[in-house]
Each structure stands twice: as structure tokens, then as C-alpha cells.
Design a protein with these regions (language model features):
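OB-fold and OB-like single-stranded nucleic-acid-recognition modules
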Residues: 1-96
Length: 96
């Protein structure tokens, strides 16, 4: 059985401003509601970029892993402010 590794470091595909890539970093709160509950997260990546998570297709809940090191695979879209949006297809929590 040949499985595709979603974390292949060399997997970067350009298509209409979108890149399929792997990102590693610390998952941090990015957005809060009026009751101070976290409603959005981003990844402060080891490449010194910030990736704002727009969606997560993985069954696991990213919010359970805030302040943890994560490795995510997904579609990255560059924003006009220099940050990036990411649609996460798969993620794993890394050992500290």
C-alpha cells in the first residue's frame, strides 16, 4: 500500500497564488469573541512567518493544541499585509 505523506518538505505546488506546503511552528490564539473565547488560531512558524488558519479539514480540533508545536500540511495563500492564510488538510502535534 503506497500512502502519500502529507508532510513531504518538497511538496510545494504553485497555482493561482496558492501553494501546497508544510508549515511547522507554535499554534497561537489569533482571534477572540466578545467573551474572550478563542475563535481563531494562527501558526507562528519557524520560518518567521505567521499563517492564519482559515479552515481545518483534519478531524482533530486545532483549538485543543494552542501553545503546542505543530506541523501542518495545507494550502497557503499570501495576503497583501505579508501574512499568510492556510487551509489545513492535516496536522500533527510535534514533540517538545
Amino acid at each position: 500500500m503506497n500512502q502519500t505523506n502529507p508532510f513531504r518538505e518538497d511538496k510545494i505546488v504553485k497555482s493561482k497564488g496558492m501553494h501546497q506546503r508544510t508549515v511547522s511552528g507554535i499554534l497561537i490564539p489569533e482571534k477572540w469573541d466578545d467573551k474572550n473565547n478563542v475563535i481563531g488560531v494562527s501558526i507562528q512558524a519557524f520560518d518567521e512567518n505567521e499563517y492564519i488558519v482559515k479552515s481545518c479539514l483534519d478531524d482533530k480540533d486545532l483549538f485543543d493544541f494552542i501553545k503546542k508545536k505543530v506541523k501542518v500540511a495545507g494550502k497557503v495563500f499570501e495576503r497583501s499585509d505579508g501574512k499568510f492564510n492556510i487551509e489545513v488538510n492535516h496536522f500533527d502535534v510535534m514533540d517538545n
